[in-house]
């Protein structure tokens, strides 16, 4: 309960697109649903957020009484992702997901002579330098990354043109660079072609997997790289972090208000508390090792 309001959770797994399928059906039935059965609030992820925010199923954040000033400490990219084609903000997140290059400290010391982040960054400062370092890693018995798929999101986050221009498919130069660089690395045996999340891809979470680096945000190393499994690199604090060749983000979860809700005031309060309250934001960082969508809090903790 929140006050005198009963909170009813609808939890659907992501497997086989079940979450989106269920959400689609429920939103389509929103208008005819009984008041207590209507969706008030729902979550979307970065990969499919625009599908929902660019429809009338989501309310503009301003309709809830939330102002631009309320969200002034949030990172702009988190707003861009949930802004519709008319320039209207349709969602808010408590989370930021900036990505870094996680490197195997032992491999760095063995091959590069140091595991200091500032020094390691010199070996991965741009893609040409990264690819040269891959040769050194191969000579020492390591793959630079587990898979060519590890770097795709970094390249694709740094495109300067759209996929479709004037009704024609367009391949950005940075995507073509990923294709060329990946083929060179794969042909040289300096990376693999495993699917992300596969068992083969995950072997590098352990020393015997002989993988130098992965790309990801805080949640990857905290929750997805076997950090709680004895014998893994993460279990022993064996991953370091460097900026890498290019900045990028991966993931994130946004709160959207459903059109038709009769609880706008409560949704406003939830969003403001969850995404703008400095004390709550700091607690999330300290308690969960997460990166929050509040530049004041993050800069303060960094200092």
Residue ranges with predicted function:
Residues 1-47:
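Early extracytoplasmic/lumenal segment of secretory-pathway proteins
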Residues 11-28, 125-129, 194-207:
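Short helix-initiation/N-cap motifs at beta->coil->alpha
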Residues 20, 31, 35, 42-100, ...:
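Hinge/lid segment of periplasmic solute-binding proteins
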Residues 28, 229-300:
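Extracytoplasmic/periplasmic substrate-recognition and gating elements
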Residues 40-43, 212-217:
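Paired acidic/hydrophobic, glycine-rich loop segments that form the ligand-binding mouth/hinge
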Residues 49-53, 218-234:
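A ligand-binding cleft/hinge motif common to bilobed small-molecule-binding domains
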Residues 99-103, 108, 255-257:
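Short glycine- and hydrophobic/aromatic-rich loop-to-beta-strand nucleating segment
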Residues 129-137, 166-199, 238:
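Glycine-centered hinge/linker elements that transmit conformational signals in sensory
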């Amino acid at each position: 309960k929140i006050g005198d309001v009963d909170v009813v959770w609808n939890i659907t797994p992501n497997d086989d697109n079940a979450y989106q399928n269920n959400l689609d059906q429920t939103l389509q039935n929103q208008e005819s649903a009984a008041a207590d059965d209507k969706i008030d609030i729902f979550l979307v992820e970065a990969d499919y957020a625009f599908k929902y925010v660019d429809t009338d199923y989501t309310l503009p954040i301003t309709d809830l009484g939330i102002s631009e000033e309320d969200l002034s400490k949030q990172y702009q990219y988190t707003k861009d992702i949930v802004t519709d084609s008319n320039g209207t903000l349709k969602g808010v997140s408590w989370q930021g997901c900036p990505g870094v290059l996680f490197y195997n400290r032992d491999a760095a010391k063995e091959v590069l002579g140091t595991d200091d982040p500032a020094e390691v960054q010199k070996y991965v400062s741009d893609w040409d330098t990264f690819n040269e370092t891959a040769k050194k890693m191969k000579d020492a018995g390591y793959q630079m990354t587990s898979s060519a798929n590890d770097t795709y999101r970094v390249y694709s986050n740094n495109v300067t043109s759209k996929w479709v221009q004037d009704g024609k498919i367009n391949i950005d130069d940075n995507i073509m660079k990923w294709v060329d660089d990946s083929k060179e690395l794969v042909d040289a045996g300096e990376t693999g072609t495993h699917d992300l999340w596969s068992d083969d891809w995950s072997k590098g979470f352990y020393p015997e997997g002989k993988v130098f680096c992965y790309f990801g945000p805080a949640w990857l190393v905290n929750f997805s790289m076997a950090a709680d499994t004895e014998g893994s690199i993460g279990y022993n604090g064996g991953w370091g972090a460097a900026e890498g060749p290019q900045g990028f983000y991966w993931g994130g979860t946004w709160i959207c208000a459903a059109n038709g809700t009769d609880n706008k005031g409560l949704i406003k309060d939830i969003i403001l508390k969850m995404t703008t309250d400095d004390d709550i934001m700091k607690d999330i960082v300290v308690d969960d090792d997460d990166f929050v969508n509040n530049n004041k809090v993050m800069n303060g903790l960094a200092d």
